[in-house]
Amino acid sequence: METEQPEETFPNTETNGEFGKRPAEDMEEEQAFKRSRNTDEMVELRILLQSKNAGAVIGKGGKNIKALRTDYNASVSVPDSSGPERILSISADIETIGEILKKIIPTLEEGLQLPSPTATSQLPLESDAVECLNYQHYKGSDFDCELRLLIHQSLAGGIIGVKGAKIKELRENTQTTIKLFQECCPQSTDRVVLIGGKPDRVVECIKIILDLISESPIKGRAQPYDPNFYDETYDYGGFTMMFDDRRGRPVGFPMRGRGGFDRMPPGRGGRPMPPSRRDYDDMSPRRGPPPPPPGRGGRGGSRARNLPLPPPPPPRGGDLMAYDRRGRPGDRYDGMVGFSADETWDSAIDTWSPSEWQMAYEPQGGSGYDYSYAGGRGSYGDLGGPIITTQVTIPKDLAGSIIGKGGQRIKQIRHESGASIKIDEPLEGSEDRIITITGTQDQIQNAQYLLQNSVKQYADVEGF
């Protein structure tokens, strides 16, 4: 069902050259990206949108979407959904899809941003609470944007390439950030590819990806994502999982700077640095680091105050997640070994040796705590080690202390640990819920610690 949006309209293609034929220099630049495609071949592109953006694509009385269909002789649809996400589907040849995207991107909302005197003086606010900024207020196309491409899970390998070579090449050649999420969208075989950068670069990257996957047949069962089945507890790369409403930026992508998306130092494949940990201090259930370890008094300075509690050292004999019914570490739960009842994390860290503290604070030998894991969640080669999966079990009445209101707590744990975390619904007649954690060993250990800490802090307070 197509809804009306009275204010957003596309620029006139005939009067605004920016959205008509591309200038010659742009065409020359694109010659650097060689593509052996049949330009007349019809392909389908599916983009995951926020529901609030659907109206901008559709337009008042369907004006915008009808113009796209007519002007480009393409199939364009944005089916209705009851959740916070909708899917933009475009069927046309690849070059035409690129032109349509360039016309749509400036109308999309950037995200939530708290109003400021500067913002309110430049933009008309419908509400004094929050304002949704629009890419359209930028001049030209010199701004950063992002799109979420949906692909069948069997096509992911063609984008990643052997040992990540293809995705690295895509990042470098198109100067974009690319994240391919491990977990499929709820009740589907689709995975999200998150692409960020300048609009022209993002579009070019999508065109190359379409060319890659159009040459590969889908393997196995195909169940396209239906946004009506969106699930807050899944970490699939959707807006509910990625968006940080306080800052209006997607978690894992950096704030915009003069040079576009910030890059990590050479040798990291051109991936972006994650947002500063300080942005999340006021949400963290952990209020600062533990006291400095013996012989490392320098950690007590101002720099250390911005560090979180470190992840635990390697397990001393089993899984870190073991709860009693009150949500505190117990001897065993469901056959999993944890800390004994008198050895909680509070007491355990007091016994750490200086080498354990150093390992916890400097997991990669650098100074301070390394957050590169958080920015690389779900993308190949960003994780610093082999990907493994583990499962832990908790009483179902403790799940709320982990998930939090609107899923905020589990979102934060995912972000801070860098791991993919999925909480299954309890089986019929069962009193337990299974938590599946995927990531590197360090990420899994950190996630387990954060999950345990969340239960310890909130189970009694919130009456679970």
Curated annotation (Swiss-Prot):
SUPFAM superfamilies: Eukaryotic type KH-domain (KH-domain type I). The modification N6-acetyllysine is found at residues 34, 198, 405. Keywords: Acetylation, Activator, Cell junction, Cell projection, Cytoplasm, DNA-binding, Glycoprotein, Isopeptide bond, Methylation, mRNA processing, mRNA splicing, Nucleus, Phosphoprotein, Repeat, Repressor, Ribonucleoprotein, RNA-binding, Spliceosome, Transcription, Transcription regulation, Ubl conjugation. There is a cross-link at residues 34, 52, 60, 163, 219, 405, 422 (Glycyl lysine isopeptide (Lys-Gly) (interchain with G-Cter in SUMO2)). Residues 42-104, 144-209, 387-451 form the KH domain. It comes from the Eukaryota. Its main location: cytoplasm. Residues 59-407 are annotated as: 5 X 4 AA repeats of G-X-G-G. The modification Phosphotyrosine is found at residue 380. One of its GO terms (molecular function) is mRNA binding. The modification Phosphothreonine is found at residue 39. This is Heterogeneous nuclear ribonucleoprotein K. It comes from Bos taurus. The gene is HNRNPK.
